[in-house]
């Protein structure tokens, strides 16, 4: 049996139950820095970002009610680092619903937004947004020229994804310049759009993300508007650790010196850096030999959670 697929078979039933349970459990330069490393942490990176600010400038491209379900596809504006990004979102909810629990359903690498109808049929209001910016699709998030690093097909389009190095090869100096920050900011803006829907109960918001959607789920778990998250096949420990095969149980253990850009990324942007600051009830699922990240470091991530 393919071990990657085994958890997926049970995921729909399990994730639904998990989100219900988890929600019930959860009633530029940076002035501040981590005392030990003198590097910024995720809360410092995000303290000046307001995901609610500015007009959505909603442009509805599809709207219908069918078989008792209301559907809406629309573009909204996200204001990030001085740029206006047009984010494509899909929304569905039972027609006439009131005070419905809200769900952010976040897609994986190179994928696109999709509504999980199992949740809609069970009474949830579901929002799914595009952050990959794949332009071959009829509708996709539109990154301006200055935000070309948001396109997952950046290389094909003449851009570069930004992690611990800038496109010119220099070391990362500003965490907000990374692709990861951009995708997280877009996600938080889409959450604001979900909360703006009349059918949604803002006190009951959950989110689940698959693969890279699970990877950026760690940041969303820090957002106080979210009560519960599920991250599956998105575990972090990619930059530096997977990139350089720095496996925890290498024998002998080998760990090349980290560059300044890697140190900054790992402190301020990496998914696992968010663990000590997550306020949402959290569930994490992953295959024991999933190549996506440093699965063997799961214990370190859990140890970092608030007790």
Please name every model-derived segment.
Residues 188-253:
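Primarily recognizes the serine-hydrolase "nucleophile elbow" in alpha/beta-hydrolase
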Residues 114, 118-120, 125-185, 236-251:
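Cap/lid segment of the alpha/beta-hydrolase catalytic domain
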Residues 291-297:
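Conserved alpha/beta-hydrolase "acid-adjacent" motif
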Residues 278, 284-286:
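Short beta-strand/loop motif that positions the catalytic acidic residue
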Residues 13-27:
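Bacterial N-terminal signal peptides
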Residues 260-274:
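Active-site nucleophile elbow and catalytic-triad environment of alpha/beta-hydrolase enzymes
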Residues 88, 98-108:
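Short beta-strand element of the alpha/beta-hydrolase
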Residues 51-97:
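N-terminal cap/lid segment of alpha/beta-hydrolase-fold proteins
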């Amino acid at each position: 049996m393919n071990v990657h697929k085994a958890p997926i078979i049970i995921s729909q039933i399990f994730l639904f139950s998990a989100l219900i349970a988890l929600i019930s459990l959860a009633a530029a330069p940076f002035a501040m820095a981590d005392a030990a490393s003198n590097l910024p942490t995720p809360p410092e990176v995000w303290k000046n970002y307001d995901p609610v600010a500015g007009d959505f400038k909603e442009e509805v491209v599809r709207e219908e009610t069918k078989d008792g379900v209301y559907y809406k596809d629309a573009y909204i504006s996200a204001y990030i680092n001085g740029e206006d990004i047009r984010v494509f979102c899909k929304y569905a909810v039972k027609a006439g619903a009131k005070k419905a629990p809200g769900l952010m359903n976040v897609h994986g690498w190179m994928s696109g937004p999709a509504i999980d109808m199992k949740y809609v049929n069970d009474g949830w209001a579901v929002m799914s947004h595009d952050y990959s910016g794949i332009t071959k699709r009829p509708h996709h998030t539109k990154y301006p020229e200055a935000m070309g690093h948001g396109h997952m097909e950046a290389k094909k389009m003449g851009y570069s994804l930004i992690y611990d190095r800038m496109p010119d090869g220099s070391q990362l100096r500003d965490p907000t310049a990374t692709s990861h920050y951009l995708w997280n900011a877009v996600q938080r803006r889409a959450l604001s759009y979900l909360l703006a829907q009349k059918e949604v109960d803002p006190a009951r918001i959950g989110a689940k993300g698959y693969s890279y959607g699970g990877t950026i789920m760690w940041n969303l778990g820090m957002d106080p508007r979210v009560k519960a998250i599920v991250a599956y096949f998105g575990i972090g420990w990619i930059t530096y650790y997977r990139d350089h095969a720095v496996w925890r149980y290498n024998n002998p253990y080998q760990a090349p010196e980290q560059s300044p850009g890697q140190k900054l990324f790992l402190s301020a942007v990496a998914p696992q850096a968010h663990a000590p600051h997550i306020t949402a009830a959290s569930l994490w699922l992953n295959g024991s030999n999933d190549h996506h990240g440093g699965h063997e470091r799961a214990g370190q991530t859990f140890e970092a959670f608030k007790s």
